[in-house]
Amino acid sequence: MEKKIGFIGCGNMGKAILGGLIASGQVLPGQIWVYTPSPDKVAALHDQFGINAAESAQEVAQIADIIFAAVKPGIMIKVLSEITSSLNKDSLVVSIAAGVTLDQLARALGHDRKIIRAMPNTPALVNAGMTSVTPNALVTPEDTADVLNIFRCFGEAEVIAEPMIHPVVGVSGSSPAYVFMFIEAMADAAVLGGMPRAQAYKFAAQAVMGSAKMVLETGEHPGALKDMVCSPGGTTIEAVRVLEEKGFRAAVIEAMTKCMEKSEKLSKS
């Protein structure tokens, strides 16, 4: 990719994008400009990755073809309003702020701007993220492909229509927390059975990771994969019976429904 890439803000998620992009070799460090309000942080990123340290958000906006706005949602609109006059005509702005809609972004930047709303999740920090990419009507297929390729440097990415953002929050953005709870609960049970805790976490986490990989790589329905493990009269079907009796599926569905409702409510506030 020959385009210049800019970052305004570079917290954990911004750094995950930056690191994944450089590691992929898609762009050279010299093609990247980063600005954060902390000079020490920018200097550290320069030392670690060899990127260009910008002196202002406006400098990033003037130079970069693709600008990742990676600041907190509460200040996103203010930051974008301050750079809009510095953007080039064909600049593409990618927001990774949860809850900030395309319309809100366009009101800050101008309705003639190319904007993408993206939502990566925290496994991006270990190169296993899942990112939704939602372009506005002005974004070209080439622009979208460039952004998808960037997010695929540290996981998977898919184009999602904006009304589907709330299900994305439930099934991807927030779901690592549910999975961590499941891993913790399984490990607690293993500890109860006598296994050392560190070993219990490793067994539980590897089982979850391996199971997810089977879903993705085999293309089999999760229910069919579950049935493969459940021998007649065996230990696994006994565990499944208890989970069903305790409302495991219903609890997950209800929790995600509430998560989606909260996401929709927050986007309107």
Curated annotation (Swiss-Prot):
Any one biological process term the GO annotation gives: L-proline biosynthetic process
Compartment annotation: Cytoplasm
Substrates-to-products reaction catalysed: L-proline + NADP(+) = (S)-1-pyrroline-5-carboxylate + NADPH + 2 H(+); L-proline + NAD(+) = (S)-1-pyrroline-5-carboxylate + NADH + 2 H(+)
Activity regulation: Inhibited by p-chloromercuribenzoate.
Membrane-spanning ranges: none
Pfam families per record: F420_oxidored, P5CR_dimer
Keywords: Amino-acid biosynthesis, Cytoplasm, NADP, Oxidoreductase, Proline biosynthesis
InterPro entries the record matches: 6-PGluconate_DH-like_C_sf (IPR008927), NAD(P)-bd_dom_sf (IPR036291), P5C_Rdtase_cat_N (IPR028939), P5CR-like_CS (IPR053790), P5CR_dimer (IPR029036), Pyrroline-COOH_reductase (IPR000304)
Main location per the UniProt record: cytoplasm
Pathway: Amino-acid biosynthesis; L-proline biosynthesis; L-proline from L-glutamate 5-semialdehyde: step 1/1
EC annotation from Swiss-Prot or TrEMBL: 1.5.1.2
Gene Ontology cellular component list: cytosol
A GO molecular-function annotation: pyrroline-5-carboxylate reductase activity
Function field: Catalyzes the reduction of 1-pyrroline-5-carboxylate (PCA) to L-proline. Does not catalyze the reverse reaction.
Alphabetical list of NCBIfam families matching this protein: proC (TIGR00112)
Additional remark text: Can use either NADPH or NADH, but the activity observed with NADPH is severalfold greater.
Family, similarity comment: Belongs to the pyrroline-5-carboxylate reductase family.
Protein name, entry field: Pyrroline-5-carboxylate reductase
